[in-house]
Amino acid sequence: VSNDGRLLPQMFEGGMITSNEIDNLTLTAGQIERATSRASSNSTGLSVAGGSEASNKFYFAGGDWKVNSDLTAQYYYANLEDYYKQHFAGLGHNLALGEGSLKTDLRYFHTTSDGKNGKEAGYSVGGYTRNGDGKIDNNTWSAAFTYSLGSHAVMLGHQRVSEDSNFVQLNQGGLVNESAGGASVYLLTDRLVNSFTRAGER
């Protein structure tokens, strides 16, 4: 989630633990409590785009399972208290094809409201929501196929965002007088001119 789009990188305060005790399985869990933006030296609580109230509890846990040398499966769960709960599933596969290789990258996010989101002032997500109440309810999926040959690669991809609300991630831009905006996210479109994360975009 850290964004490095400015001179100074975004930083987070919290803790994380990673385990590789089981063969071919990497487990990760942690908690984030505060963030320091790209344009400030002070830390703030956590929020989403449009949210003006801060949360200090972001939990995450999940794992990467290397099924074989060419196939990796991922699952992660995250919860920003009073804003959202998010499930992520991913699948990556490499296939030797002629003199090159074909990489398949599938990603799916299911995000729903948590706690005060959509119920109390300051805990609403920005942008369109189906009932106009700022409630988070989103499914986003993407598929990308990349053929690589030597030092060259060409990618064909598709991403689709459901119509009930925007895709969400940690973004403190709505916190009053903090200038703490900016976020990166695990989507194929993150480094494009537009991230295409608004409700209904594809």
Predicted regions and their residues:
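Hydrophobic, lipid-facing positions within transmembrane beta-strands of outer-membrane proteins
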Residues: 13-15, 25, 57-61, 71, ...
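Solvent-exposed loop/turn segments connecting transmembrane beta-strands
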Residues: 2-9, 35, 53-55, 78-88, ...
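Outer-membrane beta-barrel pore domains
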Residues: 79, 83, 89-202
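Short, flexible helix-coil linker/hinge segments at the edges of structured domains or between repeats
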Residues: 28-58, 111-113, 117-121
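Short, structured patches in soluble enzyme cores that scaffold and shape functional sites
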Residues: 19, 31-33, 65-67, 75-79, ...
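Repeated loop/turn-to-beta-strand initiation elements of outer-membrane beta-barrel proteins
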Residues: 1, 24-28, 36, 69-74, ...
